Amino acid sequence: MKNAARQKDIILLTIDCWRYDSPSRMPRLQAFTEDYDRAEATCQAAATNGVFPSILASTYYPEAYNDSGALHRDVRSLPEVLSDQKYATAGVIGSNPYLGKWSDRFDVFWNDGMNAAEESTNRSEYTNVHRMWNLLRLRPRVTAGEVASRGRKWFQHTSSPKFLWMHLMDLHGPYHPGLRRGLETGLFDAFYSIVQHSRHGRDAPSEVLETIRSLYWECVSKLDEQIAKVLEFIPEDAIVVIMADHGEELYHGFIGHARLYDECVRVPLFVKNAPQNMDNQLVRQLDLAPSLLDWIDVPQPNDWEGMPHSSDREQASYMINHSPLFGGTFTGIRVKNHKLIKYPNKDEPAESEIYDLIEDPAERNPLSDSSVKEELEDRLNKFLQQNNINHESLTHQTGIGGKTKRRLRELGYL
């Protein structure tokens, strides 16, 4: 089966902030993907900057970036491996300042003007007038429709085999679901809550936070209305992967993505035309790129951390997320039935919590004492020590320059 799939086109669609429970509210997506395998993925981080080295290069992000925030030149990425196999490659990104660093790994790359290898040199002609105009229309900066249009144009004018990566930002805060859906929430409440949340974050009044949560779900419904435009041009025999880069925390006292609850690090995964059955599997993002290469019978680079997914093998999912907003680094380990999360605690030793994911899937009640906690804490500490991962090194690797900070603030990272 692998040889028959060797020259198949490959489409990777990633959706920013797409929660694991979102597909149940997306009937059009469900209908369009009726013949897809439906799985879930575990993320190696809780935010865009941390997850894409695992998705595109099967590498934990502290090993992927230099101190300026750029990719190390020797990081071997999926599009580069496919290019060596005579694939044409393109990335179409719905405006994310953290993803410009991948631009030189693709033949063609569009990211709303943010294509520089280092975030600090990224520019985008987007003024306060544009920002206010889109707020008044409750419209995202780049819509799924625009990403689809650019992706379709490249795809239809490029010879096979080809690899297309599209990244949608429609679910990312600030949540702009369009005027029609804003009316359902109440336009005044929508505008007021977006402004208040941007100013005060989790300290905003409870009614503001409730409106913000409602706007997120309206954005999910809005994206569902557009999803056919994103997928309709893809040929029937192509290998297709639809996955979130990370989820979105809504119900643990914070709205956004930084901490390692399953709201952020367990995400939907839809797969079409894979040579193996992926239904109901739980796949590490670290193993996605090796799996894609395995499906087309191409060996993976020796220095990749992951391996082709196998339902017969349980792999621990390690997680690392440095959050400028929280001023610290969250780390964790997720196994089949349990998850351990270590929280930054300023100058004090990190605190940890462990959850039983079977009895407490919403992660509301950390176990008070557990032999499993000690075992997982030992495994996590060994992983961090072996990979020389610490708070100081991750702080330097953010690579955020002044020209990028405005966009990052707009997206809620700072």
Enumerate the predicted regions with their spans.
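Catalytic domains that recognize anionic headgroups
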Residues: M1-L414
